[in-house]
Amino acid sequence: MRKDGVVKVKTENGKRKAEYTYNSITTNNNYMKQLLNDHSEVNSFEREMERISPFELKNRLIEMADESIRRMMRTMLNAGRGNPNWVATLPREAFFMLGQFALMECRRDWECPEGLAGIPQKEGISARLGEFLKERHSDAAAQFLEKCFRYMIDEHSVDGDTMVHEWAECVIGDQYPVPDRILKHCEIAVQDYIAQELCDGRPPQGTIDLFATEGGTAAMCYIFDSLQQNRLLERGDTIALMTPVFTPYIEIPKLYRYNYRVTEIPAGRMSEDGMHLWQYDSKELGKLRDPEYKALFIVNPSNPPSYAMAEETVDLLVDIVNKWNPNLMIVTDDVYATYVPGFQSLMARLPHNTICVYSFSKYFGATGWRSAVIAMHRDNIFDKLIERLPRKRKTELKQRYGSIRSDVENMRFIDRMVADSRQVALNHTAGLSLPQQIQMTLFALYSIIDKREGDSFRLKMHEIIQERLKTLWTSMGFTLLPDPLRAGYYSEIDLLVWAQRFYGKDFVEWLRLNYSPLDVVFRLARETSLVVLNGGGFDGPEWSIRVSLANLKKKDYDIIGKSVRAILDSYAARWKKSLPMVESD
């Protein structure tokens, strides 16, 4: 690289040449000239786009990338969404094999040639499953189902017929979910999974109750709704939000129905040499000592920075709750927990104050399954706060839930969420669909069994993510500091940090003055058919971009990195061109 860092050069046949490779197309100085001549200064359109959600902006970027594809005949690379490009195969194979067994059980009950059959019968069904699997003993799915059966019997002494009957009915989907909150054996398996993956094998004493939901998004909706319905949060109350964060956590509190006063606690700590650590300042966190703060919302590991909360921050939060704000309600979204070795959720450290959301979507490649859980300790502050409500509020809630049970005062908050999820009146048909629950069960047991047998699934998953992350940053020419708290599912790249490191403060000020932060994401879409999201939309650094490391191939991140660097260098070249005098080499 030249000392001024404007372009990356190499010598070819005696000529100095700038070169960028993207999408299997190698371009030279002509591409640089195209960037230099494209004066996309701040305009009203970009300012307007800064006000919308990054996920809605993504649709506009895709349109621009599509136009670029038609014009330049290349492939769009969409790194704007966290939908992974992998699937966990064995638990799915087991699901389909279990479906074959369940259909045999239906036909065993009764069958007619018109395409009708009965339903699975409980008596002796576990022995029949054993024979079914024995006949297919060479199939990996059969071996896995046998391990699942043995695990539940050996670890939890469940009744074999009762459990296998639940499994068969689940995969067939012939009944309403009973219990509505989560099925018995599904809850047992997922409780063990959460203890292993979210609590690092050190769960809190007592029972963690689960509510199976239609993905993490449904869990969010149910939590916000029930907190308000049960007067735990009133319109206009003060809450805290740890940022950057998944955009809906920013947008939902602003809705007229909630209109919460939101204080953001930014992950603003920097290293001595000006690099983001993506951790929280103790002074900012100290604001939570004020009991005016009713609730704290966090995604941990974070989205988009993709870092777990540091141990000293967790310790400080524990101290704040124990000494200053014991009624603080915490909602933690831990969907990326499995990407940080040794991760411990706030649910493990502050179990009585915490609602945990966990989705199976990201780890198992299952966004389309819409499978998640809300986890709460049975002894929790939410139930206690309901007990302390004024008599008038309790009377209102008795009227709300009175059609479900006569002793509403003994109805736990988690069960109120179940009822609220179906407008109370439809509580009798509440619950996640049975096929979703059995696939969730198989996902959970797969991770548990795999860990006992060498943890190969997790290790390979981490290897894939880390290779993509390294490729992205190496191709940009930026430095990625080692950090054991990094999940790596996303990468948030603050372009101003690198602009200053490469070109200095004067260039940064010029960039801010002449361009909108969205200019980068628009140019990537328009000029290179790349879709990334603006980090400012997550209340992160204004000039940052979010790249998902989950949904493209390793070679694609090399293309993305080089394209990002090319645009940064093009800004610098234009800045130098604007200076009264530029020194030559």
Residue ranges and their predicted role:
Residues 3, 10, 21, 26-28, ...:
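PLP-dependent enzyme catalytic core of the Aspartate aminotransferase-like
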Residues 82-87, 217-219, 245-247, 301-305, ...:
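Short, solvent-exposed loop/turn segments at secondary-structure junctions
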Residues 85, 347-414:
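Active-site PLP attachment segment
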Residues 116-325, 337-351, 355, 553:
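Conserved core of the PLP fold type I
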Residues 395-464, 472:
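Structural motif of enzymes handling amino- and sulfur-group chemistry
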Residues 438-447, 454-473, 480-509, 538:
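Conserved glycine-rich beta-strand-loop-beta hairpin in the small C-terminal domain of fold type I
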